Amino acid sequence: DTDIINRNMEQMKKAYGDDPDVMVHPLIRSEEACYESAALAAGLARQFGTRLHIAHVSTEKELDLATDNISLEATVAHLFFSSADYATKRALIKCNPAIKRPEDRDALRRAIADGRISVVGTDHAPHLLADKQGGAAKATSGMPMVQFSLVTMLELMDQGIISIERLVELMCHNPAELFAINKRGYLRPGYHADIA
């Protein structure tokens, strides 16, 4: 919700200056802002009886929006990092929506395992290192992820969070089915062999 984000940014700038520390990024792009935006879209989908895919869920609260007609996607970054990582990674992990509390990350991990989240995406948005310098207002949002997505998800598999079969569903089968991508998402005769 842009109004909430703008209000939060204004409050942080008043409190901390023109470029507040990146540690407050999750307070600017807050749980409330994420939920209100997603809930508005979900309400419209229910009202008009249409399908909706909500990309980049980042909070536990958004998980309640999943239904048979409303699917959810989380990014690798939101499944791997938490707000505690801003202390060491700084703006290198600044993305939109902001990476949230450890409790949110853990809830997203449970949701990829139990099926409430049906797709894992990358939100691949690399930037020059110089563009990632600064705080919540000046550092560019986004990070490279395509080349790291599989190895990162394999780490979650090694931790016992998901199985290899579930990983394949989240990153291959489900996206192809959800978006009706012809001859993709499976290793089958006649399908594109885009596995390398």
PLM-predicted stretches and their roles:
Residues 1-120:
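Histidine/acidic residue-rich metal-binding segments in metalloenzymes
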Residues 19-39, 44-49, 119-120, 125-196:
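His/Asp/Glu-enriched, well-ordered alpha-helical/loop segment
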